[in-house]
């Protein structure tokens, strides 16, 4: 089933028409925006002041519909964009694409709510009293819901990761090439593996993210239904099996009317998702389960792969969650959220919650103590496992720790505690070298004073000059995304010790591949000589 855009006489606008006969367009998404009929809109829309398009940047004076038609013809030509990326028409095509994409989304939403799709009526303000008029099922759900939750998921997704995820769901190769071409164009800026979108292109980023999220929502609903219809389960302990049988016997007995109502009520939940906003409605247990799902989804599929064995949902309410390379703190901060689905709808204000990614000092000390760099109280000690290494390798390891501390923990913890962590690493390095050479700390400090100062002091100035960001959100992009002063300094940061496991695993794989390649070459060389 495919949707395409066509013009209807008498309305002066466009509508979505359903056609089941045209099957060759089933896997093609991007040609929707390159039909000539789509751009035959009212010229007064661009040049008159419209309250629904106040936030859109004004296009240059050279914007004309004849130029749009010419650019469409150039797009249909083979390999035009590949050889003419430096031309002035390339920037014009990009601006036209995102502007028409914004109109396309607004038109579809207005058609969905049952209005006449005429661009002349966009100037008229459509007033709604609440969100209930937009989503009718909320009138019944809000009254009987025990709790609701609001989650704002960041949308800083790397473009290459987006394209790889789309390969599993979209079979259209031309759409993937076109998507990669747009994301790697000059309109986007990349700062150390993080993409920064301009102001007018945030809607396009939300559109791609919502497509990915809808795919995993379908998978989540199937798993949600199967867990209630599952009869045979695998158990790790006999007590778990006995406890499950008791609960199952309690549910299968003939319940009263009140029990049946409560039992059926816990199975359903409702939510709204638009852009980066997500509103969950239901009982308290279901809301918590959905929050866990979306947190796990964000960390698993959009940043790094999580390890299920080290992830426990019961730890969320009490302490931080430790992923393979991330620390996530679940305690939330309340803030005032303004829900504005479209520009011509009234905004609704209500209090929501945000994820707090600030890390406390206790968990860092505990993690350093597990690695053997200090004790539970924070007193540094020597790393006995590194005594067999050379002095240069030991200094390189501590150098790597200090680099990651400056880059990842500069805004996550207080500056005073950051200096404390560096002092722990500094004294641990000296004690390790002193234990290896069987000397005192004072002698090691005199002999290696210059190299230690080069590692633990000069790296701060070096990182301040380069302004390395890595996986942090850019400051301007954070303000644009959240639009709240409280979260502009929040960031997601990597762990400084577990990152090496990724590189070690990758090096082992590369060494194994090189070994088999050399072994294969030697076999063919021996066969040639033998023959």
From Swiss-Prot:
GO molecular function terms listed in the Swiss-Prot or TrEMBL record: RNA binding
Main location: plastid
Biological process, per Gene Ontology: mRNA processing; RNA splicing; tRNA processing
InterPro entries: Domain_X, Maturase_MatK, Maturase_MatK_N
Any GO CC annotation of this UniProt entry: chloroplast
Keywords, ordered alphabetically: Chloroplast, mRNA processing, Plastid, RNA-binding, tRNA processing
Record's subcellular location: Plastid, Chloroplast
Keyword RNA-binding (UniProt): yes
Domain of life: Eukaryota
Function (record text): Usually encoded in the trnK tRNA gene intron. Probably assists in splicing its own and other chloroplast group II introns.
PANTHER family, per database record: MATURASE K
Similarity comment: family membership: Belongs to the intron maturase 2 family. MatK subfamily.
Name of the molecule in the record: Maturase K
Organism, as annotated: Ephedra sinica
């Amino acid at each position: 089933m495919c949707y395409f855009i066509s013009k209807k006489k008498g309305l002066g606008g466009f509508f979505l028409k359903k056609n089941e006969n045209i099957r060759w367009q089933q896997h093609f998404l991007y040609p929707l925006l390159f039909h000539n009929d789509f751009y035959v809109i009212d010229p007064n829309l661009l040049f008159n002041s419209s309250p629904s398009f106040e936030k859109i940047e004004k296009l240059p004076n050279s914007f004309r519909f004849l130029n749009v038609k010419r650019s469409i013809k150039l797009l249909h030509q083979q390999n035009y964009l590949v050889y003419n990326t430096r031309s002035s028409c390339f920037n014009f095509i990009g601006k036209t694409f995102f502007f028409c994409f914004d109109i396309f989304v607004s038109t579809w939403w207005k058609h969905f709510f049952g209005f006449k799709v005429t661009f002349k009526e966009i100037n008229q303000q459509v007033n709604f009293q609440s969100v209930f008029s937009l989503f009718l099922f909320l009138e019944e759900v809000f009254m009987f819901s025990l709790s609701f939750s609001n989650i704002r998921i960041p949308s800083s997704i790397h473009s290459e990761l987006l394209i790889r995820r789309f390969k599993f769901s979209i079979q259209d190769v031309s759409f993937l090439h076109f998507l990669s071409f747009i994301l790697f164009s000059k309109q986007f800026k990349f700062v150390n593996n993080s993409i920064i979108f301009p102001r007018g292109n945030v809607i396009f980023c939300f559109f791609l993210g919502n497509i990915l999220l809808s795919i995993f929502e379908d998978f989540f609903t199937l798993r949600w239904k199967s867990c209630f219809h599952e009869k045979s389960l695998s158990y790790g302990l006999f007590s778990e099996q006995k406890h499950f049988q008791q609960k199952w016997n309690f549910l299968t007995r003939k319940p009263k009317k009140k029990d049946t109502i409560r039992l059926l009520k816990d199975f359903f939940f409702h939510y709204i998702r638009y852009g980066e906003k997500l509103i969950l409605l239901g009982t308290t247990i279901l809301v918590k389960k959905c929050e866990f799902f979306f947190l796990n989804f964000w960390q698993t599929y959009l940043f790094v792969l999580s390890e299920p064995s080290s992830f426990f949902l019961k730890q969320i309410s009490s302490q931080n969650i430790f992923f393979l390379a991330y620390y996530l703190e679940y305690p939330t901060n309340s803030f005032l959220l303004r829900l504005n689905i479209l520009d011509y709808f009234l905004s609704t204000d209500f209090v929501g919650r945000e994820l707090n990614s600030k890390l406390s000092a206790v968990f860092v000390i505990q993690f350093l103590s597990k690695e053997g760099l200090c004790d539970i109280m924070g007193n540094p000690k020597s790393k006995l496992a590194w005594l067999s290494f050379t002095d240069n390798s030991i200094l390189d390891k501590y150098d790597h720790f200090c680099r990651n501390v400056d880059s990842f923990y500069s805004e996550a913890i207080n500056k005073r505690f950051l200096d404390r962590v560096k002092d722990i690493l500094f004294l641990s390095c000296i004690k390790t070298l002193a234990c290896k050479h069987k000397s005192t700390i004072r002698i090691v400090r005199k002999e290696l004073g210059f190299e230690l100062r080069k590692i633990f002091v000069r790296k701060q100035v070096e990182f301040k000059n380069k302004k390395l960001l890595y996986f942090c959100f850019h400051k301007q992009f954070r303000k644009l995304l959240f639009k709240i002063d409280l979260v502009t300094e929040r960031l997601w940061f990597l762990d400084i010790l577990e990152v090496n496991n990724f590189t070690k695993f990758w090096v082992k794989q590369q060494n194994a591949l090189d070994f088999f390649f050399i072994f294969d070459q030697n076999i063919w060389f021996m066969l040639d000589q033998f023959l």
